[in-house]
């Protein structure tokens, strides 16, 4: 999805975010985005671990 944005595209997005939210809000937005990504990765890992454990249970039976 985002694989073809490239470096210039990222710079453009950062400038647009900076203009929209201002420099004071940028750290708060970055922190919230980081926490959201961390929680998403954690949930995804838990889901795949649960599915793997369920598969192993079925194979042992």
From Swiss-Prot:
- Name the residues that span the membrane: 1-21
Query: Per its record, how is this protein called by name?
Result: Sec-independent protein translocase protein TatA
Q: How does it assemble?
A: Forms a complex with TatC.
Q: Which family does it belong to?
A: Belongs to the TatA/E family.
InterPro entries hit by this protein: TatA/B/E, TatA/E
**Record bears the keyword Transport:** yes
Question: Which biological processes are named by the entry's GO terms?
Answer: protein transport by the Tat complex
One GO cellular component this record assigns the protein to is: TAT protein transport complex
Q: Provide the membrane topology annotation.
A: Single-pass membrane protein
Q: Tell me where it resides.
A: Cell membrane
Q: Which Cys pairs does UniProt list as disulfide-bonded? A: none
The answer to whether UniProt assigns keyword Membrane to this entry is yes
Q: Which domain of life is it from?
A: Bacteria
Which keywords appear in this protein's UniProt record, sorted alphabetically?
Cell membrane, Membrane, Protein transport, Translocation, Transmembrane, Transmembrane helix, Transport
| Physiological role | Part of the twin-arginine translocation (Tat) system that transports large folded proteins containing a characteristic twin-arginine motif in their signal peptide across membranes. TatA could form the protein-conducting channel of the Tat system.
A GO MF annotation of the entry reads: protein transmembrane transporter activity
């Amino acid at each position: 999805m985002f694989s073809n944005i490239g470096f210039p595209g990222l710079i453009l997005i950062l400038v647009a975010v900076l203009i929209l939210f201002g420099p004071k809000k940028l750290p708060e937005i970055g922190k919230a985005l980081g926490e959201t990504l961390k929680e998403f990765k954690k949930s995804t890992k838990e889901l795949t671990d649960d599915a793997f454990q369920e598969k192993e249970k079925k194979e042992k039976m």
